[in-house]
From Swiss-Prot:
It is found in: Plastid, Chloroplast. It comes from Gracilaria tenuistipitata var. liui. One of its GO terms (molecular function) is structural constituent of ribosome. Pfam families: Ribosomal_L33 (PF00471). This is Large ribosomal subunit protein bL33c. Keywords: Chloroplast, Plastid, Ribonucleoprotein, Ribosomal protein.
């Protein structure tokens, strides 16, 4: 039998540029990344700086449900 993953869960990170109306975007839409996190070590929502190809620059990506 296989073990369960335990405290590791899959999360979705969404670009925060959707809130900024004054920036010029390369494409329209919202870009998302998927990642995993350990629920025991990081119970709060994650916020990372990652590259957004729609904005063509590094932006904050926040964890969504």
């Amino acid at each position: 039998m296989s073990k369960s993953k335990g405290a590791r869960i899959v999360i979705t990170l969404e670009c925060c540029c959707r809130n900024l109306n004054n920036i010029t975007k390369k494409k329209s839409g919202i870009f998302r990344y998927t990642s995993t996190k350990n629920r025991k070590n990081t119970p709060n929502r994650i916020e990372l700086m990652k590259f957004c190809p729609y904005c063509n620059k590094h932006q904050k990506f926040r964890e969504i449900k």
